[in-house]
Amino acid sequence: MQKFEPKSIRTQVAMEIENRIFSGDLKVGERLPSERELAHELGVSRSLVNLAILDLESIGFLKTIPRQGTFVADYKNEGTPQMLLSLMVNGVSNNTAVELFTSLMETRILLENECAKRAAENATDSDLELLSNLLEQMRAAKEPAQFSEANFRFHRALMSASGNIVYAMIFQSFELVIRYYVSKYFTSTSRMRVSVSQHENLLKALVEHDASKASEAVQIIMHEGITRLNELFGKKRTQRS
């Protein structure tokens, strides 16, 4: 491991441990070196190592067993949305991150598809007005960041329009991960224009209370995103290999 300069040391220590997990140097169920050993190896204080370990515990990478030590957790099955985001941002070149990305998008397709159908049946006038306003914000956006924000809020409003509050909660729990992907996807005005057209079709189906067309429209949106993001991450994996 490298020794760190005194800049965001706590974060850097946590990321170094993450990288050892991603690379397979530390495997699920394996015990970490003691805090004293890690501190000596990294050239930092034990208190900073302890804080970094607590951070990694909170998002599901590590677990501490009293009088036994700290171990790599079964993060695939016991992790959190924050852990998933960390995998995507820092571990996108490994197979686990790709697998998790695919699983996340499959889950989102199921969720958005069901919500689109329910929203076509249950959306109120105020729901449709909000969706229309957010679509107008997407049309008017000049910068990718503005567009990404309006896009995220549109899909969050779609969840609420379904009438199922748990769907909206599930979507919100993945906010950080979804925002990350949305920001990576909308990097050009051409993609923004295509997305506006696709969302116009979705809103039209909702206004017409056509569940079948709403389902079709949202699946087109999701599959387009999956294709483009897979291309992006494929390029990154090639560059890092």
Enumerate the predicted regions with their spans.
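Generic hydrophobic alpha-helical segments
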Residues: 17, 138, 201-202, 206
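Conserved amphipathic alpha-helical segments that form helical-bundle/coiled-coil interaction surfaces
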Residues: 104-184, 195-199, 213-227
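An N-terminal domain-start capping segment
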Residues: 64, 76-82, 145-150, 210-213
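Short linear motifs at protein or domain termini
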Residues: 1-110, 235
